[in-house]
């Protein structure tokens, strides 16, 4: 939905699933330690004139310490444990392996739904019962779940390469990367979808060697 809604929040950010709000800092979002809304258009105070601000109109929220506030005597930095492995990752990897061995295995949907249940969203067994046993549709569901659940955890780069789909529509790692119009000086114009960089991916890049220090 286009336009700016109540409280200065763009309508396109409303009624998203819970993981969106736990992962992304978007225009109109309020940092919980203050009542100040965050905006990224020119002159907003958080635009890209600052070296540490957004180039796309979004910032990462997932994994950020919600007790920090760069004002007054508040804590401005804190160490946090990094995520190497998560149970959700294992559930989805196992579901993917089962789907390649035996698509009719009931554990496939059950493991995907374990991740969705924790996220507080409807279960596939209830809203998409027709995909059960269909290898292609189950694979699609697993890939979508990995993209959302494991966002910003360093998995996507490797997922699209092991699936050999990094040059396919919907998974492309090359071409223009879009965000908001960071040159706009008001929220309405800022919400225009705008390319902010162009990346290159060619099929030969699937064959990049693994660095020795990674082995």
In which residue ranges do the predicted regions lie?
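Acidic/polar-rich alpha-helix caps and helix-coil junctions
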Residues: 1-215
């Amino acid at each position: 939905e286009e336009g700016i809604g109540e409280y200065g929040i763009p309508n396109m950010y409303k009624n998203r699933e819970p993981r969106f709000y736990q992962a992304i800092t978007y225009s109109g979002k309020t940092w919980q330690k203050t009542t100040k809304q965050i905006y990224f258009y020119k002159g907003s105070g958080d635009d890209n004139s600052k070296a540490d601000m957004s180039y796309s109109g979004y910032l990462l929220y997932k994994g950020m310490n919600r007790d920090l506030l760069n004002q007054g005597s508040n804590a401005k930095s804190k160490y946090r444990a990094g995520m190497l492995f998560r149970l959700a990752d294992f559930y989805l990897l196992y579901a993917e392996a089962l789907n390649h061995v035996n698509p009719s295995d009931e554990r496939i949907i059950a493991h995907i739904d374990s991740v969705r249940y924790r996220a507080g969203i409807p279960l596939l067994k209830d809203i998409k019962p027709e995909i059960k046993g269909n290898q292609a549709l189950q694979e699609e569901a697993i890939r979508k779940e990995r993209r959302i659940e494991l966002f910003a955890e360093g998995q996507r780069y490797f997922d699209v390469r092991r699936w050999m789909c990094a040059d396919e529509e919907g998974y492309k790692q090359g071409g223009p990367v879009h965000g908001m119009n960071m040159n706009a000086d008001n929220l309405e114009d800022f919400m225009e979808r705008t390319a902010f960089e162009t990346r290159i991916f060619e099929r030969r890049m699937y064959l990049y060697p693994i660095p020795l220090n990674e082995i």
